Amino acid sequence: LHMTMHSLTKSAIFFAVGHIAQVKGTQKIAEIRGLTQSHPALGWGLVIGVVAIAGLPPLGIFMSEFLIVSSTFAREPLLAVPLVFGLLVAFGALTLRMTDIAFGKPTGNLGPVEASYVPLYAHLALVFIAGFYLPGPLVSWFQNVARLLG
């Protein structure tokens, strides 16, 4: 479950970053600011993707990370502490970087770019839906895979 949610979210972020590089004409994080103002669909898509990859509710990665953390606490409590610490550090780093990129003063653009946001938002929609509902057959499939892997 976690690998599926992570893959969907990460690919959505990659779609967003590719569009950002086209629109801004750079891949340098320090030169990209204010995306939610200058390119709202792109900026908010990136924000949602980063929030999802950080494992915040109600998105699907939260559910999978919660299951991982709670299982770790139940089986190996000493391993759960560094796991939670690592998740908190990752969240802090993502938040620190994302603040200026999304909400800072907008920087220059190369101009309009013809790009589809369908893949970005389709992947994010699946991750969002998975935070609330997983169909029974999909849950059974994930459980069978988990049993096979031990």
PLM region descriptions:
Residues 9-82, 108-127:
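Interfacial and helix-entry/exit segments of alpha-helical transmembrane bundles
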Residues 77-97:
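Alpha-helical transmembrane segments of multi-pass integral membrane proteins
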Residues 8-13, 146-150:
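Alpha-helical transmembrane segments and their membrane-interface exit regions
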Residues 2-7:
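Short alpha-helical catalytic segment bearing the HExxH-like zincin motif
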Residues 39-42, 91, 95-150:
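Cytoplasmic/organellar membrane-interface segments at the starts of transmembrane helices
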